[in-house]
């Protein structure tokens, strides 16, 4: 573009770095599930997090790859269009993500188990990522407790809130898996990838926690539209 290779542009470099970090986080989370299963420990919650995160992050990576290819992304010979199509179904197969998030969120609310912290027992290059992880962990614990007190058993009817809590936990879990993997390998590459992955995941998780405060209003506004939406559908014969 403009006589320069795409990789020379900082915007492209940032996108590719984030894609690589997402792949690292996906691999880390799947490895974590496998290791726990090998120890014959329960993988129910962790496997849910891996399924949701990996199916959504992989599709996002493929979508960005199509964008970077430009019009060539739609040409079958490049292979990325097929990756995008095939990647989309994974959010539905083996349990739709929306349903899994409800189950996972309700599990978090009933478990009352504090989220583990990483502290400072990590490589110096991961201190920032570990601090971001621990801030999110404490924020999630506080938000879960506030939700329990505010809604009690009625929280099962607050699906938007429950899903946002679960998404914050998925981000936290993927960030922790990334940091722990990099701490074990201690290679410069893994440390750099884990830092990008964990910082981004924790920022996303914090946004989901912020969104929980707006969940009731979002649900109310959506409910107000239902009459028009379904009336329009009936008029159209649907």
Label the model's feature ranges:
Residues 1-238:
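Alpha-helical interface subdomain recognition
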């Amino acid at each position: 573009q403009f006589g320069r290779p795409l990789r020379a542009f900082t915007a492209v470099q940032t996108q590719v770095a984030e894609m690589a970090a997402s792949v690292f986080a996906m691999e880390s989370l799947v490895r974590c599930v496998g290791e726990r299963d090998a120890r014959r420990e329960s993988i129910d919650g962790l496997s849910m997090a891996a399924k949701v995160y990996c199916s959504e992050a992989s599709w996002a990576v493929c979508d960005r790859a199509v964008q970077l290819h430009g019009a060539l992304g739609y040409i079958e010979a490049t292979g990325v269009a097929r990756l995008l199509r095939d990647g989309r179904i994974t959010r539905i197969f083996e349990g739709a993500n929306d349903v899994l998030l409800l189950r996972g969120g309700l599990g978090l609310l009933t478990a009352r188990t504090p989220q583990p912290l990483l502290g400072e027992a990590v490589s110096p290059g991961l201190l920032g990522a570990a601090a971001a992880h621990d801030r999110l962990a404490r924020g999630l614990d506080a938000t879960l407790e506030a939700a329990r007190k505010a809604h009690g058993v009625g929280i099962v009817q607050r699906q938007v809130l429950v899903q946002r809590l679960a998404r914050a936990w998925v981000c936290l879990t993927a960030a922790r898996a990334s940091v722990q993997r990099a701490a074990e390998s201690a290679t410069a590459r893994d440390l750099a990838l884990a830092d990008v992955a964990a910082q981004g995941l924790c920022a996303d998780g914090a946004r989901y926690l912020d969104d929980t405060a707006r969940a009731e209003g979002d649900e109310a506004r959506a409910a107000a539209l239902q009459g028009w939406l379904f009336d329009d559908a009936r008029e159209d014969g649907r």
